[in-house]
Amino acid sequence: MESGSKMTARLMLAVGGAVLGSLQFGYNTGVINRPQKVIEDFYNHTWLYRYEEPISPATLTTLWSLSVAIFSVGGMIGSFSVGLFVNRFGRRNSMLMSNILAFLAAVLMGFSKMALSFEMLILGRFIIGLYSGLTTGFVPMYVGEVSPTALRGALGTFHQLGIVLGILIAQVFGLDLIMGNDSLWPLLLGFIFVPALLQCIILPFAPESPRFLLINRNEENKAKSVLKKLRGTTDVSSDLQEMKEESRQMMREKKVTIMELFRSPMYRQPILIAIVLQLSQQLSGINAVFYYSTSIFEKSGVEQPVYATIGSGVVNTAFTVVSLFVVERAGRRTLHLIGLAGMAGCAILMTIALTLLDQMPWMSYLSIVAIFGFVAFFEIGPGPIPWFIVAELFSQGPRPAAFAVAGLSNWTSNFIVGMGFQYIAQLCGSYVFIIFTVLLVLFFIFTYFKVPETKGRTFDEIAYRFRQGGASQSDKTPDEFHSLGADSQV
């Protein structure tokens, strides 16, 4: 591997410390599902203690739905606030500061049972949602800016790997025999204190983003020193030259606001791509598959369906690792297309299997294969790629605003799916996956015609292509647009 493009200890420390925030996001996404019954019992017990009457089913459903959905509301607000922190405090320091929210949420949720307060639990879920929303901007941005061009895709996938590992840990810890029981569920929710503490210990030893130091702070000597440590070489002239060119371009541009992303022809195309890729992740049907998985495993005769669900979490993690190793060879666009096409095929298989399940019980095994296939294809493309490609599509100036918009798109679609899926599933039954198949095909078409290949390109080279296209970008043919990564394919 060429000098400056190798994995160094300092680079691994920086990425590893950052993705602890991604793990927190994944953990808090999955942790609330397993202990639902014991937490609802706690709500009922608290209500009975306060009002001397059992809680009504409608009120209990409302409180539980609020406990789940408030996490996404916090995420929406947090993701939209990314730009307020990263330019003022830096990328690394913003991640460190956000752990205040994680510690506060851990205390509120961990002591909610002792205080007989479901309000503390709900408030804690909102605060950890704020933290997670910030994390979905901070981590991919920081990792993208500290990584060498040749490793940017592979290291960018670590954000998604952290998320799926967090979900898997939550599934395992949520088992009744570990912490998903009546006595230990507060510890399950308060466990977020541990990764927050670890991140506070590790990140002070990680460097600030060299791009932030040079382009935002004009501290060239510090940026040069950081680059030497990150790259493991004394010759960082090419990195510095690329950053200086980006800095000169940024000085010629006025400050980029969120509205400017949509008004300017130069930014309109990349922000549209960023938004649609985020939607392709959340509207792909992955949450629907996890929702259906336990009932499908039960119908197929699996005695402990929860362990089969954990098995799908293992597949989730394993194929994220696969994506990590192939993303720099195959390219982002190619993997995203493969993932979308594979998911559409598996969604059709699931629809057929679920429709014929009552007449042909063996179809349950086909549905299990389809579930594992769906999850695997998700982690090959739509899972990891939308997160880090935002950093690649934008230069230093508009990047924070772009992450705010992309993050808000992701969290909003997550919230909509979370709130609306059960109603759609009741209405459509097993045919619900036809809706996701149509969406996946539409996302495939958009990706094929509009999304460029960014593999092997510097941030400035990618931004230059969009600047060159400007308002006429949409008039380019697919072949011209895809030339962005053509020479890296040969």
Curated annotation (Swiss-Prot):
Segments on the Cytoplasmic face: 1-10, 87-89, 144-154, 206-270, 328-333, 388-400, 450-490
Alphabetized Pfam families for the sequence: Sugar_tr
Keyword Cell membrane found: yes
Ranges per topology, Extracellular: 33-65, 112-119, 176-184, 293-305, 355-364, 422-428
SUPFAM superfamilies: MFS general substrate transporter
Gene3D superfamilies with a match to the protein in the record: MFS general substrate transporter like domains (1.20.1250.20)
Tissue expression from the record: Retinal cones (at protein level).
Membrane disposition: Multi-pass membrane protein
Catalysed reaction, written as an equation: D-glucose(out) = D-glucose(in)
Ligand binding (D-glucose): 160, 281-282, 287, 316, 379, 387
Positions annotated as glycosylated: 44
GO molecular function, one term: D-glucose transmembrane transporter activity
Membrane spanning residue stretches: 11-32, 66-86, 90-111, 120-143, 155-175, 185-205, 271-292, 306-327, 334-354, 365-387, 401-421, 429-449
GO cellular component: apical plasma membrane; basolateral plasma membrane; cortical actin cytoskeleton; photoreceptor inner segment; plasma membrane
InterPro entries for this protein: Glu_transpt_1, GLUT, MFS_dom, MFS_sugar_transport-like, MFS_trans_sf, Sugar/inositol_transpt, Sugar_transporter_CS
Subunit architecture: Interacts with isoform 1 of BSG.
PANTHER family linked to this entry: SOLUTE CARRIER FAMILY 2, SOLUTE CARRIER FAMILY 2, FACILITATED GLUCOSE TRANSPORTER MEMBER 1
Protein name: Solute carrier family 2, facilitated glucose transporter member 1
